[in-house]
Amino acid sequence: MKIKFVLLVSIMFFILGACSTSNNGQTSPVNIKHYEVQTNFTVPKNPVQDTSTPAQLDYAVFNRYYYNPEPAQLRAILILMPGLFGGAGDFDKMAKTIVQMGKGDVEVWTVDRRSSLLNDLTGLQAAWNSHDPSLAISYYFSGATIDGKTYAGTPQTTSISYMSEWGLDMTLRDLNTIISLIPQQYRETNVFLGGHSLGAFLAQDYAAYDFGDYPTTTDPGYKNIAGVILLDGGGSGLFFTMSEAQYLSGTWFTMNISGAQFTLPSLSMIRQNPSSVIAAGLLDLIEPMFLNMFTFAQIIGMYAFLEPNQISNIIQVNQFKIIVAALLGNTQFKATNQAALGFAMDRHFMPISIFSATLGNANGPLTSTTSSFFSGITISQPTDKGTMVYTWNTQGHITNITDLSAALSNTYTTISERYFPTRLILDSIALGGDYGPTQTTDWRYQQGMHVIHNAQMDAPVIAFGGGAGVETTTTVFEQYIGLLPPARNCNGEPRTMCGFDIYIMPNYTHLDVLFSDPELSSNNVDAMIYNWILDHSTGSIPTSVLP
């Protein structure tokens, strides 16, 4: 197996409290390595376009957060899968916090799905290394050359038509490639799998998946993990139930997901129409604008981290003006870099709820209005036309805006997945309703979705919902309980009594579940996960056996 990794010490110093150099000049307690692991299976080719996944993309990708100095033994490894349009950077704050809590007795591995290999991070890396975010703007939007390289732009969808086959099976086999780096004898006792949003569904899919030739041979995912962690996602049922006819060749149909409109194609349409292979192309938005939003977020986050109190000039960048106008209805206001990030991602201003956090509020005149871009959604907007400078206050925050800006500033990963494959959404929705086949004759099993072992999945589960997020009640988690047998080590007691813990975090948005400030409460999500992992792990893992 070919493994590529980079020790990221040289770029970790920007993470406050969890970096190679802290504010007092001492060595930080967290190291990060970026891994790309060659997979040992073949992704099918697009049978219509006759295109195959290139060999350079046949890698599973993750980032390993571990303590410095590295201990000889670990109590557990937590592996985290991001959600829809999410990248490994979503877990940056959570990973560093959990690693530091026990001084290294828990490692965290954050998954970047293989589409991250399509990203060109040259401009962001140069911007960070020079502490000059304007370099990223010049590289991505003005044709600037960095180290002899110019930005080639968004890949033409005709050149990535092979992504029609990047569905559930490939995603879970990539995840299994990562988990398989840990020796078998430690997995069922010391490896925990979690996910956020759609990633929570993928985590429970993995637990119920069969990687063998079922029923002749079985290789269930739950035998590789000690527990499952659901973060504002998962449970039973995703959006609605899909028929086989809709999946294979149905007409296009529209869904509303937290204010964003998706027009979802069938499998045959994804294969026939290259423009539909990435989910950004399905939004009721101009695709380049939506992809620019991801770049905009990272650059504005870097400005907010490096120069929080300086007046922002990113608002006036031509490529971003359309985004600012769509979100805020005003491009003439002045704001500090930190306030600009708040305007971009705080729940008062961001109309797409799955991309918002509770960061505080702006200091300056505001108005409440209905978003012109997302009908029916009420947001706040700045009203001043440049006579004063908006600043940011953190009163009432749940997520620390500095933690969010640090995660957005990552240049070894991203907080978003620009090229999220549509096929993975299609497969995930197909598993809605009763959530997964129970027989090999089920059409979903026949289409390669081998989520067959819910009735045998005995790993313990802990689930978190956001009171202002996606899972606002316990209902979908309770429905999931009904699919599962008693948990291991629960002496046959039903899941309602043992082996399934549910917490709804009051007023948390979808991102607050990941980024909530641990200083606000000792009973925060990070601490609850850490303590739950220690309660459910057995023995230890020698770090000498890890990659």
Predicted ranges, named:
Residues 194-199, 203:
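Gly/Ala-rich beta-loop-alpha elbow adjacent to hydrolase catalytic centers
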Residues 16-27:
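Bacterial Sec-dependent N-terminal signal peptides
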Residues 25-70:
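N-terminal cap/lid segment of alpha/beta-hydrolase-fold proteins
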